[in-house]
Amino acid sequence: MKIIMLGAPGAGKGTQAKQIADKYTIPHISTGDIFRANIKNGTELGKKAKAYMDQGALVPDELTCDLVMDRIAQDDCKNGFVLDGFPRTIPQAEALTAALNKIGQSMDYAIDVDVPDENIVNRMSVRRACLNCGATYHIVSIPTKVEGICDRCGSETVLRDDDKPETVQKRLSVYHEQTQPLIDYYKEQGILKSVDGTQPMDKVFADITAILEA
């Protein structure tokens, strides 16, 4: 079961991807997590990625594609995987399709978590992220047990630069220009499914599960 999660930044696709991965015992492959690990470790890739992410811009294809392809080739992906944050552009999608075709495979589903822009801005302004492990929280619906401290590792949680309202607006503009065309791309391939991302998270997940098990 090979799944791509689509949707604007802050639509909740990462949360849903993790739940899918847990339920079906397949890896959750998040480019965001990979980038944050590189940023934390101060790698050259991390420094380059951070410069783009802090501006609300997309990390260029060449910094992303090979990394994801190598991850997909690992043994734990042989029964499937959930891609979260990749592909983000038509060239990335075409590269992924070509790479999978070479090994006689293709994606099974592209699931679009659909949320209006206004909801996204409001939602992300109350999001907090752990500086150490990348865990995300919502100060209303998913607060930390101790304010400002990550439940998972005990490190500080902050409003990330790329979650600030002015950056979110820019990220949404970039999304509509570069990433939303993927909706049409996967619709043409016949694998696009859409769910209403404004619903409670458990209802969104129930809708996704119904699609995967139909």
Indicate where each model-derived feature is located.
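Glycine-rich phosphate-binding loop of ATP-dependent small-molecule kinases
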Residues: 1-214
